[in-house]
Amino acid sequence: MSWQTYVDEHLMCEIEGHHLTSAAIVGHDGTVWAQSAAFPQFKPEEMTNIMKDFDEPGFLAPTGLFLGPTKYMVIQGEPGAVIRGKKGSGGITVKKTGQALVVGIYDEPMTPGQCNMVVERLGDYLVEQGL
């Protein structure tokens, strides 16, 4: 299965009539493996900072998580495994696997819990596959 298929069918899937605003699978080095059409352009240092927060949980808390034009307030995640961010009625979930970051961005009417479920389910599957 291609990385784009994972994004299109597993991240951008419909959940109770709603779906993520955008999603991507990005290598630990910041290289985009696959993304949805609306996924924001981001700066390399934004991915570097996300990776640093996985290595040093709490690194992003003082400054926020930046991805493209958006700044998210970092909220409770799972140290070393999941980073969650909030902005207004939307937010972001980033799940780290052995080789990649699975990123989902949502806005109302999708809920944070639905975003977490979609992103973490694919992330957990990739971890099980050794990816």
Swiss-Prot record:
GO terms for cellular component: cell cortex; cytoskeleton. Keywords: Actin-binding, Cytoplasm, Cytoskeleton. Its main location: cytoplasm. It is found in: Cytoplasm, Cytoskeleton. The keyword Cytoplasm applies. It comes from the Eukaryota. One of its GO terms (molecular function) is actin monomer binding. SUPFAM superfamilies: Profilin (actin-binding protein). Pfam families: Profilin. Occurs in many kinds of cells as a complex with monomeric actin in a 1:1 ratio. Belongs to the profilin family. Binds to actin and affects the structure of the cytoskeleton. At high concentrations, profilin prevents the polymerization of actin, whereas it enhances it at low concentrations. By binding to PIP2, it inhibits the formation of IP3 and DG. May serve as a modulator in pollen germination and pollen tube growth. This is Profilin-A. It comes from Oryza sativa subsp. japonica (Rice). The lineage of its organism: Eukaryota, Viridiplantae, Streptophyta, Embryophyta, Tracheophyta.
